[in-house]
Structure formats: C-alpha cells, structure tokens
Amino acid sequence: MLSFLSSNLSSTRQSLAQVLNFALVLSTAFMLWKGLSVFTASSSPIVVVLSGSMEPAFQRGDLLFLWNRSPRAELGEIVVYNVRGKDIPIVHRVVRTFPQIEGKAKKVKEVTEASSVPPNMLLTKGDNNIADDTELYAKNQDFLHREEDIVGSVRGYMPMVGYVTIMLSEHPWLKTVLLGIMGLMVILQREQ
C-alpha cells in the first residue's frame, strides 16, 4: 500500500514538474516578445510577409524585423502598417509624404531630405502593385498617420523562415497534426 502511494506521489510530482516546465517555456517566450516590443517600440517587432506585393524586395514567407523609434518615415522606406479596424500587417514602401499643417493634411510636392517640414502623413505602395494603397486604407482615409498606423520600419529580414506560419494559417488541419505530434511526444517521453 505504501509503495502504491509513493508511486502515485512520484507520478503526480512528475506531472506537476512537466506542467511547470511548460509554463516556464511559455512565460519566457512571452517575456522575450514583450522585451523585444519595448526595445523596438513596436507592438509587433517581427512580422511575416503574407503576399507578393513587395516582390522582388521581399518574397511571400520572409520574416521581417521592425524598428519603430524613428520619428519620421523617409521616401522609399519600407514600412509595416495595420489598416484601421483590421489586424493584418501590410508591408509596403513609402512613395509620398504629406506634412501636417494645422491639423489637416495638405498635399505638397514630395518632401526631400533637405526639407524642414516633418512628414507625419504617408502614402504607400507595394513594389509589385500598379496603384498606391489608398484603396486598402480605411474608409475616408487618404493617407497613413506615422504615429497611429505604422507598426514599424523594416530593418532586416530572414528569407522564407515565416512560411511555416503561412502554412499553418492556410491549412488548419496542419495545426491539429502538429499539436497531435507534440502531445504524442509528451506522452512517449513520460513513459520513459
């Protein structure tokens, strides 16, 4: 009887240790993500290119590293933005800037680097697209606000690494298979 209680206690202890290890892995990943978010000043410091609109600069599945500490975006800079009301990151190039004058947007010629007017409003376009992004913006929005809409500027990338994310979102059954394999590995590891 005592050996039964001892083995039960040992099994419970092992299960608790596995749960705590799993929680430790999750909390470490979360803390690293939040730390990276604070360091880059971006709510999403790493994003995956979801379409071919930026080819040949970036391919679908490329993993992008963002930085959002620059107060202004320059012409030609590649930025990631979210459309208001939607949570889909769009990666496109700044093709025009508009200075903010008395709270309203005023179209002017493209701002050059020598200009002293801070460009707070941007127009973007995918390198592989024919037209600019005004059709993608929210209703009654003709430009992006640098402070409100921009998630970050691209500072680096890793080709094709993000394709796993795309495959998992396009084929939901792969998530089930992956979770099943992970669960099977936990069960098999426990038996050893």
Swiss-Prot record:
<dbReference type="GO" id="GO:0006465">
    <property type="term" value="P:signal peptide processing"/>
</dbReference>
<dbReference type="InterPro" id="IPR001733">
    <property type="entry name" value="Peptidase_S26B"/>
</dbReference>
<dbReference type="InterPro" id="IPR019533">
    <property type="entry name" value="Peptidase_S26"/>
</dbReference>
<keyword id="KW-0378">Hydrolase</keyword>
<feature type="active site" description="Charge relay system">
    <location>
        <position position="133"/>
    </location>
</feature>
<dbReference type="InterPro" id="IPR036286">
    <property type="entry name" value="LexA/Signal_pep-like_sf"/>
</dbReference>
<protein>
    <recommendedName>
        <fullName>Signal peptidase complex catalytic subunit sec11</fullName>
        <ecNumber>3.4.21.89</ecNumber>
    </recommendedName>
</protein>
<keyword id="KW-0472">Membrane</keyword>
<comment type="function">
    <text>Catalytic component of the signal peptidase complex (SPC) which catalyzes the cleavage of N-terminal signal sequences from nascent proteins as they are translocated into the lumen of the endoplasmic reticulum. Specifically cleaves N-terminal signal peptides that contain a hydrophobic alpha-helix (h-region) shorter than 18-20 amino acids.</text>
</comment>
<keyword id="KW-0645">Protease</keyword>
<keyword id="KW-1133">Transmembrane helix</keyword>
<keyword id="KW-0735">Signal-anchor</keyword>
<dbReference type="InterPro" id="IPR019756">
    <property type="entry name" value="Pept_S26A_signal_pept_1_Ser-AS"/>
</dbReference>
<feature type="topological domain" description="Lumenal">
    <location>
        <begin position="40"/>
        <end position="192"/>
    </location>
</feature>
<feature type="active site" description="Charge relay system">
    <location>
        <position position="92"/>
    </location>
</feature>
<comment type="similarity">
    <text>Belongs to the peptidase S26B family.</text>
</comment>
<dbReference type="GO" id="GO:0045047">
    <property type="term" value="P:protein targeting to ER"/>
</dbReference>
<feature type="transmembrane region" description="Helical; Signal-anchor for type II membrane protein">
    <location>
        <begin position="19"/>
        <end position="39"/>
    </location>
</feature>
<comment type="subunit">
    <text>Component of the signal peptidase complex (SPC) composed of a catalytic subunit SEC11 and three accessory subunits SPC1, SPC2 and SPC3. The complex induces a local thinning of the ER membrane which is used to measure the length of the signal peptide (SP) h-region of protein substrates. This ensures the selectivity of the complex towards h-regions shorter than 18-20 amino acids. SPC associates with the translocon complex.</text>
</comment>
<dbReference type="GO" id="GO:0004252">
    <property type="term" value="F:serine-type endopeptidase activity"/>
</dbReference>
<keyword id="KW-0256">Endoplasmic reticulum</keyword>
<feature type="region of interest" description="C-terminal short (CTS) helix">
    <location>
        <begin position="177"/>
        <end position="188"/>
    </location>
</feature>
<feature type="topological domain" description="Cytoplasmic">
    <location>
        <begin position="1"/>
        <end position="18"/>
    </location>
</feature>
<dbReference type="GO" id="GO:0005787">
    <property type="term" value="C:signal peptidase complex"/>
</dbReference>
<feature type="active site" description="Charge relay system">
    <location>
        <position position="53"/>
    </location>
</feature>
<keyword id="KW-0812">Transmembrane</keyword>
